[in-house]
């Protein structure tokens, strides 16, 4: 790690030592107290056979290793005192929150389009309270974790996310989840414009679409909006001193 590390966040002199996370395009100095692990939309809709993405024709057959890696990152974050924040994407059962024909979301959401093509699915996809909306069984929040509902691709839109972060002094966001090229990237981009430092753990994310969508999203993030790292590097960086993961 020869490159000098970028200082993430405000790096307050509070006696808490900063850690250096191996990342691209350069290492990042981060403090656990200024950092949150963000788990994006790990719901049946996005990660399970029979969920919305699967029914809409997207391949979800390789989400299993992503779930395993997210669990590993969550365990490391909790052990380091880093807040774990789960996003849960969806709308009220009447889909008022989804917007009507006057909203671009009504026209572009593949969940809404799939239900219009298949009326028998109406009320099932991404509806709060339903199986599709639920987080996958393997990634249930633990005591102390935070769950933030959201209604659009970006977790900052019309949600409590920014308030949750600012009230805790969080400046650094470490992203995992689905989909890299949609909700992960959208939230990281919005965070960039709100002065948050965004890192994606590439092996704890999965795209909606072909593999080139994953690679394009990671390229955009590394080049323009944030940093790319891995679950192993995250776990090693934030393991208790003298106790490598």
Curated annotation (Swiss-Prot):
The keyword Electron transport appears for this protein: no
Catalytic reaction equation(s): (Z)-3-ureidoacrylate + H2O + H(+) = (Z)-3-aminoacrylate + NH4(+) + CO2; (Z)-3-ureidoacrylate + H2O = (Z)-3-aminoacrylate + carbamate + H(+); (Z)-2-methylureidoacrylate + H2O + H(+) = (Z)-2-methylaminoacrylate + NH4(+) + CO2
Sample GO molecular function, one term: hydrolase activity, acting on carbon-nitrogen (but not peptide) bonds, in linear amides
Record carries keyword Hydrolase: yes
Taxonomy, superkingdom: Bacteria
One BP term from GO: nitrogen utilization
CDD domains with a match to the protein in the record: cysteine_hydrolases
Active site residues of this protein: 41, 150, 183
Keywords: Hydrolase
Any Pfam family matching the protein: Isochorismatase
Annotated EC: 3.5.1.110
Protein purpose: Hydrolyzes ureidoacrylate to form aminoacrylate and carbamate. The carbamate hydrolyzes spontaneously, thereby releasing one of the nitrogen atoms of the pyrimidine ring as ammonia and one of its carbon atoms as CO2.
Family label: Belongs to the isochorismatase family. RutB subfamily.
Record protein name field: Ureidoacrylate amidohydrolase RutB
Organism: Pseudomonas savastanoi pv. phaseolicola (strain 1448A / Race 6)
Gene field: rutB
